[in-house]
């Protein structure tokens, strides 16, 4: 049976040498297969969960993270502390019913809190992450030593479970088939030991060939296939490492790009500059035959550089970009692969590796995200297969792996530990059941305090293109170490809220100087237009998207200001000023005014805001409204809030609640879920947004309908059902936040109970 190990418990006896940590591994989460673990009842539950997912896999794409529930001893059919409540349509929602629902929800949710104080949950969704890992481990010859047979079996289970009915795989688990998803996952299965004619492999191969073959894969896919040896480097558009030698004042210097963009293209440029290809094995030779509609030696690689299957083409290359890549390919690259210009190429490669090592060491070899994690691992092996850097990388592979009833996946980060915990604290506090769940809050409080980043990155931040970090919070763990603006804001809000509660219940408050450090970071992140981006200041211009080579993703080249990040920061600064007047008060006031103007400017004419990190208009609507309220705006004095309420109310479903499809993100048009079904997370976001805007004073009917939906949807054990995917990044790729299904219904019902049902 698979068991989740967290924190220091996740470190084996022989692992300590190759696992660096500045926090005693706080928040680390690793799944380990324990053959003797689990009772007969638990093993039966695991079998049932797997079978149920597989049988319904074409209709329900999300796992329910049932392995966590099973491990922590909460059976799905068991009730909480109080009996379940079901309200009839039109029945009055009484406070007792809400309190009963909340008690059951918190009884369940507190029971799955980890010993470190955070909540561990599925952060999967993208279907291109696992194949990259498999390819890198295969090329470096460590696939079977890093991944046990149980890991490999679960990975195959996952890939098969998320194969679409047409035989292909999507960009993410709910998406239609793409060449990027299909070719990479087909390759992953082959490298994991699947025979070319086993199971659904022929159907997958047919999809690939029927859609033109793997020459139509996106640029990221072309790179992975080139590394493996089943695609030629001459079929890639150039990624010259010399960009890292350019002066910083140039607007297209990599240091000015969004950190995820530059940290992915950094190792890609190294591999491209090296033209690295792994060992040509029998499987590689076979894949050269399996993936293409014409013989491998007859493929026109120059033409293939700009070939992209129409199913993948979310962001088509502008003509100017094709001309640029063509010039670099035909003129620049022939020069820089020969003496004397080759000496500059060698210097550029050395510079790239210096930046790779800096990133690795500052994240304890976790890295910013899963893509650059695996690419950096590969680069370290290419540089020196016997290096300590490579060995340190291998020990962090398992930080990204998550197993559930749908199999083992690679997550979009090393977890969402701090993010989910900060939200969970705010949700629990909203219920006013603090005395009942003091131990839960105390553990969560300790986790938040210990997760704060307490030092800046070493060295000159200008050399390594880093922002100040001291006082910030990360998305996941302190060992990961990258600051994010809204994570800092939510972490600060959670710490401030708990500081208002009795210390004997929730523990000692965070020291004032550390709160001030967080405020200093937030103030340093405001852009000229008043908005806040994600990781850093916006360092260049939107026109740089003209050179975005990733056909699958939108708005990736620079770090844009976001409604969500701006609103969260406004709330945190407002609460801080209220509780700690005197620290940079005038600057905080000015920042909030400028941020409010940014939110109003970002609002669309129909009253909506586009959400960049959640699905989509409901998510951004919640943030937009509460940000303006934090700035002192009200429904009566702010047209933007009135328009936002009108927009959200216009999307209410006939039976109550809201249900928004991920297609809203992709197409930038509000789209209901298929069949006009409500979604509990969307409903919770809108319920909180409308409460914040004073809807109860005008017409509470939509609020009552939403609350009734949440209560009636609760499961017998107090859990809430997992529904469609609710996270997004780069406009077009969805990501799972499994904890959201509990956090936001609890939070919304807490707000509803104490701000709407006042009697």
Curated annotation (Swiss-Prot):
Enzyme class: isomerase
Record function comment: Oxidosqualene cyclase involved in the biosynthesis of the highly oxygenated tetracyclic triterpenes mogrosides and cucurbitacins. Cucurbitacins have cytotoxic properties and exhibit deterrent taste as a defense barrier against herbivores. Mogrosides are nonsugar highly oxygenated compounds used as high-intensity zero-calorie sweeteners; they also possess pharmacological properties such as regulating immunity, lowering blood sugar and lipid levels, protecting the liver, and acting as antioxidants and antitumor agents. Converts oxidosqualene to cucurbitadienol.
Record-linked Pfam families: SQHop_cyclase_C (PF13243), SQHop_cyclase_N (PF13249)
Gene: CBQ
Misc. comment: Cucurbitadienol has anti-inflammation, anti-cancer activities, and acts as a precursor of traditional Chinese medicine active ingredients mogroside and cucurbitacin.
Name of the protein: Cucurbitadienol synthase
PROSITE patterns per record: TERPENE_SYNTHASES
The family this protein is said to belong to: Belongs to the terpene cyclase/mutase family.
Cited NCBIfam families: squalene_cyclas
GO annotation, biological process: triterpenoid biosynthetic process
Gene Ontology cellular component list: lipid droplet
